[in-house]
UniProtKB/Swiss-Prot annotation:
It comes from Lactobacillus helveticus (strain DPC 4571). F-type ATPases have 2 components, CF(1) - the catalytic core - and CF(0) - the membrane proton channel. CF(1) has five subunits: alpha(3), beta(3), gamma(1), delta(1), epsilon(1). CF(0) has three main subunits: a(1), b(2) and c(9-12). The alpha and beta chains form an alternating ring which encloses part of the gamma chain. CF(1) is attached to CF(0) by a central stalk formed by the gamma and epsilon chains, while a peripheral stalk is formed by the delta and b chains. The gene is atpA. This is ATP synthase subunit alpha. The record marks S362 as: Required for activity. Pfam families: ATP-synt_ab, ATP-synt_ab_C, ATP-synt_ab_N.
Length: 503
């Protein structure tokens, strides 16, 4: 077969046209040490902080320490099959996780891989776990309430969409229950929820997932789980992975609620990694940048401006205290980053006041702007009344000769405490919360025995559902109190027919 000269020249021209003079250079290093979830590698001179690195066996790691002689790497997942002398190469990108609707209703690990046995997650979109927080001009003020369904929170420490509200307290004071109940209350509220379990026992997470399924909440919830048996890097990246999943919905104009349960365990995992990487320890052996660990995470929660779609990401970080000490390092850090805190007290919890919210130490710095007008009106004096009651209660123990005004305050205080109690997994719609608080603040409960308050509330709700649904509808749809005379007459009519329990 003969080839003509002009064919050769046209082939050469064709090759020259498509010639790419770019060289494909991969920077490769060698592992010099591996153990306890970290590795050191020599030869990655141009690696960037936070860059994703790939090991020979297919495992991934994140460049954490950039020293002159080597790079400190935190290994994602199991590190048993990585050996000294293995090769590790740069990827030129930071770690990403799958995002989108395909994750809703699933339980995943911090890498976005399913752990619920329900098969593969088909998602073609990913987002980097580290993202710059929205700037000042990209945000708008919090102006829409996020109803938790918990009377003590919606009345005393209201939360708005786009807020960061810390839940803080000792172990076994109901922190997780508060967060789970808030997720349950988002049913039919068009809010996507993400529950990030960091270092929680597998059995505990299983129980929470079963609860969410039982109440139909998994239809709008993603669970990200990093168990205590996982290597420390997985616990460290879990909140960032959860936030990346939430940001995808936020930037598409949706409202998202994310719960971090809990950030104390993430801080401990980060301390472990930092000490293994030989970073200098600071207060309580935490590294110097532990504040930045949480601030860069929580600053990503925001209410976006209308120009960016008006979506929101509301964060409920949880912090565990030791013996009620909220002045420890991590609690004070997170208190200063968030827009308020809900403080749960073990004394109240064991005394039967549940949720055990300490009204004196709990505050919401921006949620008040988002509260509906009806709730603002009925709950206005509730906090001061409760604080006055707690003060009087301690004095009343010393003597029985109390004047009428003091006795009236004590009676009202006892009923306030009773009204704010609420059973587990029983969120109450905001219109019914307004109703019972209206009855309380207008004195309709003053003559009801304390032990009958709970029954009075339930029967009042049933009565209004059947006979005065229009009044509840007005509160729900307008956010304002209905006509004072009508509401008072309806409550009065029910109060007269209510029969207290016989002693």
């Amino acid at each position: 077969m003969s080839i003509k000269a002009e064919e050769i020249s046209s082939l050469i021209k064709q090759q020259l046209e498509h010639y790419d003079d770019k060289l494909d250079i991969n920077e490769v290093g060698v592992v010099t040490y591996v153990g306890d979830g970290i590795a050191r590698a020599h030869g990655l001179n141009n690696a960037l902080a936070g860059e994703l690195l790939k090991f020979d066996n297919g495992s991934y790691g994140i460049a954490q320490n950039l020293d002159s002689s080597d790079v400190g790497i935190i290994i994602l997942g199991q590190f048993d099959n990585i050996r000294e002398g293995d090769r590790v190469q740069r990827t030129g990108r930071i770690m990403s996780v799958p995002v989108g609707d395909a994750l809703i209703g699933r339980v995943v690990n911090p890498l976005g891989q399913p752990v619920d046995g329900l098969g593969e997650i088909k998602s073609d979109k990913t987002r980097p776990i580290e993202e710059k927080a929205p700037g000042v001009m990209d945000r708008q003020s919090v102006n829409q309430p996020l109803q938790t369904g918990i009377k003590a929170i919606d009345a005393l420490v209201p939360i708005g969409r786009g807020q960061r509200e810390l839940i803080i307290g000792d172990r076994k004071t109901g922190k997780t229950s508060l967060a789970i109940d808030t997720i349950l209350n988002q049913k039919n509220q068009d809010v996507i929820c993400i529950y990030v379990a960091i270092g929680q026992k597998e059995s505990t997470v299983r129980t929470q997932v079963e609860t969410l399924k039982r109440f139909g909440a998994m239809d709008y919830t993603i669970v990200v789980e990093a168990g205590p048996s996982e290597p420390a890097p997985m616990l460290y990246i879990a909140p960032y992975a959860g936030t990346a999943m939430g940001e995808e919905f936020m930037y598409n104009g949706k409202d998202v609620l994310i719960v971090f349960d809990d950030l104390s365990k993430q801080a401990v995992a980060y301390r472990e990694l930092s000490l293994l990487l030989r970073r200098p320890p600071g207060r309580e052996a935490y590294p110097g940048d532990v504040f930045y660990l949480h601030s860069r995470l929580l600053e990503r929660s925001a209410k976006l401006s209308d120009k960016l779609g008006g979506g929101s990401l509301t964060a409920l970080p949880i912090i565990q205290t030791e013996a009620g000490d909220i002045s420890a390092y991590i609690p004070t850090n997170v208190i200063s980053i968030t827009d308020g805190q809900i403080f749960l007290q073990s004394d109240l919890f064991f005394a039967g006041t549940r949720p055990a919210i300490d009204a004196g130490n709990s505050v919401s710095r921006v949620g008040g702007n988002a509260q509906i007008k009806a709730m603002k009106k009925v709950a206005g004096t509730l906090r001061t009344d409760l604080a006055a009651y707690r003060e009087l209660e301690s004095f009343a123990q010393f003597g029985s000769d109390l004047d009428q005004a003091t006795q009236a305050k004590l009676n009202r205080g006892q009923r306030t405490v009773e009204v704010l109690k609420q059973p587990l997994h029983d969120p109450i719609p905001v219109e019914k919360q307004v109703l019972i608080l209206y009855a309380l603040t207008h004195g309709y409960l003053d003559s009801i025995p304390v032990e009958d308050i709970s029954r009075f509330q339930n029967e009042l709700f049933d009565n209004f559902d059947s006979s005065h649904a229009d009044l509840l509808k007005t509160i729900r749809e307008t956010g304002k109190l209905p006509d004072d005379k009508k509401l008072s007459a309806a409550i009065e009519e029910f109060s007269e027919s209510f029969a207290p329990s016989e002693k």
